[in-house]
Amino acid sequence: MRRISALLTAFLLTLTCLTAMAQTPAGKIDGTIKDENGQPIEAVTITLLQAKDSGRLKETVTSKTGHFTFDNLPTGKYFVTASSVGYSQLYSRVLELGTGRLAQTLPPLVMTGVTTSLHEVAVVGRRPPIEQKPDRTIINVDASPSNTGSTAMDVLEKAPGVTLDKDDNISLKGKQGVQVMIDGKPTYLSAAQLADYLRSLPASAIDQIELMTNPSAKYDAAGNSGIINIKTKKNKLKGFNGNVTLTHTQGVYPKPSGSLNLNYRTGQFNFFLNAGYSHWEGFQVLQINRKYLDADAAQTINSIFQQTTVMRFTNPEANVKFGMDYFLNQKTTLGFVVSGFRNKEQDRSGSNIQLMNPNYQIDSLVYSPNTNNTTWKNGSANLNFRHQYDSAGRELSADLDYVRYSSISDQYFNNLTYSPDNVLLDQSILTGTLPSTINIYTFKTDYTRPLAKGYKLETGIKLSYVNTNNTANYYDVVGTKSNVDTTKTNAFIYRENVNAAYVNMTKQYGKWTVQAGARLENTNYYGHQLGNGLTVINNDSSFSRSYTNLFPTLYLTYQASEKNQFTLNYGRRIDRPAYQDLNPFLFFLDEYTYQAGNPYLQPQYTQNVELSHTYNRSLTTTLNYSYTQNFFTQTFEQSGQATIVRNGNIGVRQNAGVSVSYMLPVAKWWTAVLYSDVNYTKFTGVLYGQDLDVQATTLLVNVNNQFNLAHGWTGELSGFYRTKGVEGQVVVYPLGQGTAAISKKIMKDKASLKLAVRDFLYTNKPHGYIDFQETDATFNNRHDSRQVAMTFTWNFGKPLKGMSGASKKNGGAGEEKSRVKAGGNAN
């Protein structure tokens, strides 16, 4: 409670010091963008400029009605520009805001379609599925019909530059260690928990996904490969409105889901409610073959292990989010958000294991029917504040957050050993109960201020505190009696505190824009293995560490011409071990495979450099290089016939690559988004006393074809292909997937039907091999990836008369606003 009180006090003090803010006259400029047929154009980039020197002030994008608004403008002369792929750039007349006329509405601005040199066809502008910005790539989830009935993990898997390994660990441009954020906030989940969460988060709840390979100092330094920010939907229209989405997905097993989004905004208040439910069923078939070798020069085979595990899971999940914004005036907003979800996963598996001699003759057979039932709950609360001093961009925001995760897993392992002629030789039953809780407290504040001579200052602080409690109670079952297994029963607590402060300075020199920043982070953590007091192995032990690091960033942008832009950026980042990865006790997957933590695991540090060129806002080419020290990844240690999987620091990772992203207007009705990257990765170090020196070059190709057909029909054909790659000890063979979808607007464009088929060739089957110590292993993994999904979406309600929600539309300069409405900024 003391920590909560301290954070709340800091939050209230921040608000109190702002109660005497001076009020200045605030003007407004708005307008509408239409095409040559008089139809509104969505997602057009609108830039507000000063008439005296053409200096850029703000940027936004048009709403679905083609509307845009710039609020809180001081008196002066302005004009706007409108730009969108497939249209000629448009300039408005000069508008003057002065005493007696603080609001100006432009007449409808008509954009003219341009003709490409490819086939001399016109291109229709619309919200693209993928947008390439100087500092990030944006995935517009609803723009792709193939996202129908999918999950956040499915969307990420086909995102440009994103790859998933055999355990669904996420890599960005060939590098692991990505920080995944939800609405600008870290999840604080382990890799396995994050994968489970993303598999349960429906794509229908997501608005955008931002991919940032080298974020500025404003963001957490965590994530050596960058940040993936998943922005959930937030209704922005005034009045009462909402939508209902119903989806049925069918693979081998059914996966129904539904969601409801409501929003009511009137006067000084905005209320919103999002709720959803999904019931996913699926399967996984995992085949593992291990050859145990003698430690002699010949590496002769000592024994052979072949395992086939069939898993069936059921995963019902319910989620809800409720929030309110109170607009004190045009400049100041207070808000709160509460949310939660409940997930109850039931996993049932059966493993058939053959233990053989070097001549492939069976020595024994093991059959293991296992169950693992996990109930996972989350609750969070946020208080947020935002104040815009003026239209020049001076702004202050503050957030106070509390997040709690709790879970309990009930495990049952039954191992039956048979002779080659199927005579039962032995049976062992192990049960486990593993409760866990995570509590997270954060406070942060951000301040932005334009300074004299064109400088812009950004600064802020963030304080976070995390505590976790984990217990593992294991029992050996003999007959009807359960006895405590003292070699496995354990308890572990972990505490972590990170204090951060950052500063960014931006300045434009003619065609050059320079941003230099630095983030200082102080980390303190403490882990305590409580033990069970019954064995020497699990006696009480603890560890702690404190360290402070500086993380500089630098961005140089050169606008060579209207169509050519060059960007060079540098950043230093950190990736801290997940608290579960520091937990030293074992977690059982089956009798021959364990997971364990490593209390000696150190953070890894990465230096990233990128050079990119963007042509005509459609073709972006990027060169990148990164160097990671203390690189940690999943390692495999052999203990008898059992394999122990744990994270370990293995040495140095170097990554060099080139990527190309191109939005190609093939025809008036056909736009292709092409992405490709080539990455060279090298690992050097020492692992379990053996030298490690592995390298690989991997090609990733991602193609997304969007078809804008007549009479409200749209279609998509997309896919990706990845050649062989390496991650530490693991080599993964080529992998790919194809997706097709079609969508139709109905009910006077208030509703839509979407049909999608994912992995229609059933090629998304991760497989590869692992060489470690005196063991060679291969693995093959297939799951319920081939699916057909049908979705119905109905949008209802309408804005109040004379009121527009465009001021809350998420645009280039509205990122902070969007994050505040989500309950906070990404920091």
Predicted region positions:
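Short, acidic, small-residue-rich periplasmic hinge/interaction motif at the N-terminus
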Residues: 34, 39, 45-49, 83-85, ...
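N-terminal periplasmic accessory domains that precede
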Residues: 108-110, 152-155, 194-196, 211, ...
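Structural signature of Gram-negative outer-membrane beta-barrels, strongest in the C-terminal barrel
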Residues: 400-403, 436-442, 448-469, 483-629, ...
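Short, acidic Ser/Thr/Gly-rich low-complexity loop/linker segments typical of extracellular
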Residues: 51-67
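Outer-membrane beta-barrel translocator/receptor signature
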Residues: 221-228, 236-287, 315-318
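Short acidic/polar hinge/loop motifs at secondary-structure boundaries
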Residues: 97, 186-213
